[in-house]
């Protein structure tokens, strides 16, 4: 084959590749450059969610302890004919599992329902209660074996409900004061969220003392792009808590106070259905580093890794997952 023919073939191939790339770019530009309304009202329908959180404690030498795995099965149904009427959430099942041990159920939460809706000021907190989730429901919990859950375990279960609504509502829906997902119009935009540098209430338990506080860092949301989850087109929105800090004062017994001081950083992604605006999937990772002082005892340094996945599932799949334990 002559050099001229080879050069001609090479040039034609290059032109074809450039033309194909140009066509793809022309098709992609309207999608990538258009404006989206991610805060549009959600479709009025029932939803079914499976949530799993794994908590891993590290020894001071870096050894990983067997993980605690918490699972929440939550249904959601319209409470009225309008989204303004809110949604009725029902807990079908909550379980925990240590390492490879048996999955253990929390019977008192089976069938527990609550109304989740915006208040008159547009927020989700109800009467000073964080996201309207009554922490009293999580006092004195016992598992299906009749064992009383220690306060830290009960708090982790309570916190699953808080995390669920923080990600699926606080981050994924319009904020009343601005600085929310409604400000993300184009792919590539990033905002500082209204939750940045705030101090959420720490009145989470009768054992938590005055002086406890959690301070958010620079919480951000970023419109990363578009994705597909199980065949459903979604907007991909990243979140990052920045450098958060906390002080927790707990009295497990009248004569013992435990003071925990530390820092937290969590980050993850929301997958929001483009058609319905419901959250299809959430992934979250968190690292917590703290020092625990138990009265006159030696202080203990603690490192905790936490990962969470929330998935919307079909009703039949939900019923299958909610069986057992």
List PLM regions with ranges:
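Bacterial N-terminal signal peptides that target proteins for export
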Residues: 1-11
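Bacterial N-terminal signal peptides
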Residues: 10-20
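Signature of exported/secreted
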Residues: 26-325
């Amino acid at each position: 084959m002559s050099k001229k023919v080879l050069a001609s073939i090479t040039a034609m191939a290059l032109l074809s590749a450039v033309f194909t790339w140009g066509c793809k770019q022309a098709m992609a530009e309207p999608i990538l450059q258009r404006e989206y309304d991610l805060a549009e009202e959600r479709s009025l329908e029932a939803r079914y969610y499976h949530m799993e959180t794994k908590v891993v404690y590290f020894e001071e030498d870096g050894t990983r302890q067997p993980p605690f795995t918490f699972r929440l099965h939550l249904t959601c149904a319209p409470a009225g004919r309008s989204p303004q009427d809110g949604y009725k959430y029902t807990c079908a099942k909550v379980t925990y599992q240590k390492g490879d041990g048996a999955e253990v159920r929390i019977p008192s939460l089976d069938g527990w329902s609550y109304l989740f809706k915006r208040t008159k000021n547009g927020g989700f907190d109800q009467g000073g209660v964080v996201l309207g989730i009554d922490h009293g429901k999580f006092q004195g919990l016992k598992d299906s074996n009749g064992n009383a859950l220690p306060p830290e375990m009960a708090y982790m279960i309570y916190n699953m409900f808080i995390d669920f609504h923080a990600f699926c509502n606080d981050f994924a829906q319009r904020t009343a004061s601005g600085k929310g997902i409604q400000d993300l119009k184009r792919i590539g935009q990033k905002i500082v969220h209204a939750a940045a540098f705030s101090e959420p209430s720490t009145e989470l338990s009768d054992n938590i003392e005055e002086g406890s506080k959690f301070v958010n860092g620079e919480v951000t949301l970023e419109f990363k792009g578009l994705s597909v989850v199980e065949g459903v087109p979604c907007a991909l929105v990243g979140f990052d808590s920045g450098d958060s800090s906390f002080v927790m004062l707990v009295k497990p017994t009248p004569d013992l106070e435990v003071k925990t001081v530390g820092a937290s950083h969590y980050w993850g992604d929301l997958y929001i259905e483009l058609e319905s605006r419901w959250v299809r999937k959430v992934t979250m990772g968190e690292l917590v580093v703290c020092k625990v002082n138990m009265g006159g005892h030696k202080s203990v340094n603690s490192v905790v890794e936490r990962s969470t996945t929330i998935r919307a599932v079909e009703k039949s799949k939900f019923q299958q997952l909610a069986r057992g334990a």
